[in-house]
A protein has these predicted regions:
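Active-site recognition of the HExxH zinc-binding catalytic motif
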Residues: 53-65
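Active-site scaffold of zinc-dependent metalloenzymes
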Residues: 1-51, 65-66, 72-81, 85
């Protein structure tokens, strides 16, 4: 469990074919953030740098929900991808 802006979140590792990893368009992905359950679902097949990237991406969604940001989903996805790739470098400056 972790908190962002006093909102408690959980991380669950699930089977790569789990319904929990299904996107709204019906495709399966590697990670999903579920606001209603305050849970990040990650494929248990992830490891190493890919796990770090997917988790970082999902944490952006957690922060967006926790701070009640209303960002269009296509923009939020771009921000999440950017931070998952370059966030450590930006923060480390």
């Amino acid at each position: 469990m972790f908190k962002i802006n006093d909102v408690e979140w959980n991380i669950l590792y699930v089977n790569p074919n789990s319904e929990c990893l299904m996107r709204s368009d019906g495709t399966i992905t590697l990670g999903v953030t579920d606001w209603s359950k305050r849970t990040v679902y990650l494929s248990n097949a992830l490891s190493g740098s890919l796990l770090e990237k997917v988790l970082s991406h999902e944490l952006v969604h957690c922060a967006s929900f926790s701070y009640d940001c209303h960002i269009p989903i296509n923009v939020e996805e771009i921000v999440a991808d950017f931070l998952s790739l370059y966030g450590k470098e930006v923060v480390g400056i």
